[in-house]
């Protein structure tokens, strides 16, 4: 938008901030013409009209339709092998702890959409890894054996194969939960969609156990934990074999070893910033392996539209 009246600068900025932080959050472009930029206006201009208070208002949260919510919860209650895939919408709604609690309380394995904001620390018990069969191969087992995939705060884009098989099997029920209608429109491929603030949905889901409506045991969760451990152990063993062979042949350090060494030198107060093709690829793998061994980092920044 372009500000065409200097007396309405306050109004335009207030509206831009509201648009940027509500619904489907994101950047808003606001132009200020040079003639207005170099003009002067009274400090109180615009305050004679509502809203009289220019303080930031609480962010509006989408509350789920009871009937639609009940349909999703019924699917979850009847599921034997559910999976949660979290995206940047969880981060925008400050619902990371709600996500972790749902996974822990209900024994549901949690995955992160690749190139989206990291939601949970790699050391979190319910977090398995990326929903990516290349950077985290055990996710293939989880997705291909699942009967319900709950995609919360994410888009069914190329990272998730647009929700299509073979990434998410045809036999699996695919549900998308988003905090804005704009995001839901991008997820038309879902079998079922729910307009809801991610935190509200995750809390309601988590409360199923407290209300004695959740019967899923720990077998499915433990299967995924076992697959993760097997992958970590095999990856480290293969790396050890390759390192020994490299020493004999005068080869160079493996990029996975380099990534692990970098993180080994870091503390829980350090941020890891990764970028660039193979560096990013191997670092993502190393992050999961190191996290499985108890490594904690303050945070991770990486390339991607939703990071």
Each predicted region: which residue ranges?
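Conformationally flexible catalytic loops at phosphate/diphosphate-handling active centers
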Residues: 15, 19-78
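Conserved thiamine diphosphate
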Residues: 1-23, 60, 145-146, 191-193, ...
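Short internal beta-strands
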Residues: 31, 108-114, 175-178
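Short beta-strand segments
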Residues: 4, 29-33, 85, 151-153, ...
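Anionic-ligand anchoring segments at beta-strand to alpha-helix junctions in alpha/beta enzyme folds, i.e.
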Residues: 64, 76-149, 265-307
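Gly-rich Lys/Arg/Thr-decorated short loops/hinges at beta-loop-alpha junctions or inter-strand turns
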Residues: 45-57, 121-122, 232-246, 293-298
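Phosphate/pyrophosphate-binding active-site segments
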Residues: 74, 175-276
């Amino acid at each position: 938008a372009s500000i065409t009246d200097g007396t309405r600068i306050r109004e335009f900025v207030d509206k831009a901030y509201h648009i940027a932080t509500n619904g489907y959050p994101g950047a808003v472009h606001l132009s200020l013409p040079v003639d207005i930029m170099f003009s002067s206006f009274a400090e109180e201009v615009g305050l004679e009209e509502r809203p009289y208070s220019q303080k930031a208002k609480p962010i509006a949260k989408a509350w789920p339709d009871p009937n639609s919510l009940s349909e999703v919860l019924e699917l979850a209650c009847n599921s034997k092998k559910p999976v949660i895939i979290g995206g940047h919408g969880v981060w925008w709604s400050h619902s990371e702890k709600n996500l972790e609690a749902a996974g822990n309380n209900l024994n549901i394995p949690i995955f992160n959409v690749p190139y989206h904001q990291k939601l949970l620390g790699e050391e979190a018990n319910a977090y398995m890894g990326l929903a990516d069969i290349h950077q985290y191969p055990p996710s293939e087992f989880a997705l291909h054996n699942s009967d319900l995939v709950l995609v919360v705060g994410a888009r069914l884009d190329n990272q998730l194969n647009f929700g299509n098989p073979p990434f998410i099997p045809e036999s699996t029920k695919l549900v998308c939960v988003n905090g804005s209608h704009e995001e839901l429109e991008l997820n038309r491929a879902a079998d079922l969609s729910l307009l809801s603030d991610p935190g509200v949905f995750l809390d309601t889901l988590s409360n199923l156990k407290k209300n004695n409506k959740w019967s899923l045991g720990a077998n499915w969760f433990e299967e995924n934990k076992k697959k993760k451990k097997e992958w970590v152990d095999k990856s480290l063993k293969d790396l050890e074999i390759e390192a020994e062979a490299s020493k004999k042949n005068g080869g160079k350090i493996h990029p996975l070893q380099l990534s692990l060494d970098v993180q080994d030198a870091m503390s829980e107060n350090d941020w890891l910033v990764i970028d660039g093709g193979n560096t990013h690829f191997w670092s993502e793998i190393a992050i999961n392996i190191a996290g499985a061994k108890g490594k904690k980092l303050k945070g991770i920044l990486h390339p991607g539209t939703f990071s």
